[in-house]
């Protein structure tokens, strides 16, 4: 399953908001430096979907706020 994520980094409160079936807003405390925010988003998504971090992969948007992830939950 592919999902679109709008990343909000440097937030005081971390969390995930589901806007539609495959569109999410993910807030993380980490800043977008050295991939820390991407790693935090992957961790948040894996916790949300209750799957291993290795099943969440960033397809596009490595340096963008708009990201495309693939979730392998099979």
Positions of PLM-derived features:
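Compact, glycine-rich, soluble single-domain proteins
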Residues: 4, 25-49
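N-terminal first-folded block
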Residues: 1-27
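Detector for Asparagine
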Residues: 22, 38, 72-73
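Solvent-exposed residues in well-ordered beta-strands and their adjoining turns
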Residues: 8, 29, 72-74
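Arg/Lys-rich, often Gly-containing low-complexity segments of ribosomal proteins
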Residues: 10-11, 30-38, 60-64
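C-terminal structural segments of small proteins and small subunits
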Residues: 42-74
């Amino acid at each position: 399953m592919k999902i679109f994520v709008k990343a909000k980094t440097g937030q005081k409160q971390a969390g995930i908001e589901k806007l539609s079936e495959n569109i999410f807003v993910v807030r993380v405390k980490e800043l977008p430096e050295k991939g820390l925010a991407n790693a935090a988003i992957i961790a948040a998504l894996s916790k949300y979907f209750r799957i291993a971090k290795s099943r969440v992969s960033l397809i596009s948007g490595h340096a963008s706020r708009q990201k495309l992830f693939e979730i392998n939950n099979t």
